[in-house]
């Protein structure tokens, strides 16, 4: 609104009689008195003013509101910050239909590839619906967004340096120069098991995400998309994916994942425990079947002596 009146934000707030008020507090919720001041100076209705705020978001979801320096539409004016683009689970501009860009100007299709992006679209849409319902306090089904994010961001394996597949091609001298980078431990999280496509394209140093809700609220465009896809997949088959994460975990990682799963409903945890036991049993049987068996050596004494063989042959 400030740009519409050709004013800076501080000038506009002073004109409204709201000088000194925090801008983000006003965008979050307006009191009746603050709304009346804006209505008196702009001529808009109270309903129109309240529709510009995030009053429908729950307090826990306030941290999800992205600021001006977040992801942006390349076709929207620089001085326009749309409310519809302020959620980290929105990846296309609803006005222009363009893919959002990150701080470097890259889009998700450029980072993931068109084919991979199309394959992930269904789960990304399902995850966006779940997150939007959670932010507005609506029903979310059996699992809530915070519970799923806790599992996705759990460290399922100990930190380890980049593997050969994660390292770029470089000469021997370059490897010596970047020895510190090649030996730097990287956090390993369940997100890479649930969304292996993210593990393939994410820069190795930028793979780790912040724990829980902070991973979505403060993550990059690619990280937010991967977490949204992960939520869409967990909603579809939570038991199978939880087992996949546990089987891919090391001993300490299994404990951390189990801690994150404690917030899940008891019925789901019982199904996970039962199927995990069967999966471990089947894996153990498969390994035993693949192990080559040695020919058993007999320890019985020979009843025929060697000299008898020689006599018979002669």
Predicted feature locations:
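Basic, alpha-helical nucleic-acid-binding regions used in initiation and control of genome expression
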Residues: 1-314
């Amino acid at each position: 609104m400030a740009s519409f009146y050709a004013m800076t934000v501080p000038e506009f707030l002073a004109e409204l009689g709201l000088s000194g008020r925090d801008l983000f507090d006003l965008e979050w919720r307006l009191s009746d008195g603050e709304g009346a001041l804006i209505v008196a100076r702009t001529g808009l209705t109270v309903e129109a003013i309240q529709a510009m705020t995030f009053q429908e978001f729950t307090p826990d979801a306030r941290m999800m509101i992205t600021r001006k320096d977040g992801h942006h539409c390349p076709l929207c004016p620089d001085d326009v910050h749309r409310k519809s683009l302020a959620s980290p689970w929105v990846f296309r501009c609803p006005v222009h239909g363009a893919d959002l860009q990150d701080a470097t100007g890259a889009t998700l299709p450029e980072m993931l590839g068109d084919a991979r992006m199309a394959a992930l679209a269904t789960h990304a849409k399902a995850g966006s619906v779940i997150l939007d319902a959670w932010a507005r306090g609506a029903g979310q089904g059996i699992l809530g967004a915070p519970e799923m994010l806790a599992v996705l961001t759990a460290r399922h394996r100990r930190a380890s340096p980049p593997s050969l597949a994660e390292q770029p091609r470089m000469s021997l001298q370059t490897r010596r120069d970047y020895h510190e980078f090649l030996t730097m431990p990287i956090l390993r999280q369940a997100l890479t098991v649930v969304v292996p496509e993210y593990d393939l394209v994410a820069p190795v140093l930028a793979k780790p995400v912040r724990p829980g809700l902070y991973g979505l609220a403060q993550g990059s465009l690619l990280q937010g998309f991967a977490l949204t896809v992960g939520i869409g997949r967990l909603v579809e088959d939570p038991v199978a994916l939880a087992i996949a994460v546990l089987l891919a975990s090391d001993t300490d990682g299994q404990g951390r994942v189990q801690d994150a799963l404690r917030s899940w409903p008891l019925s789901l945890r019982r199904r996970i425990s039962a199927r995990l036991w069967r999966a471990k049993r089947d894996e153990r049987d498969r390994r035993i079947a693949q192990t080559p068996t040695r020919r058993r050596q007999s320890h019985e004494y020979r009843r025929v002596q060697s000299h008898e063989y020689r006599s018979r042959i002669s």
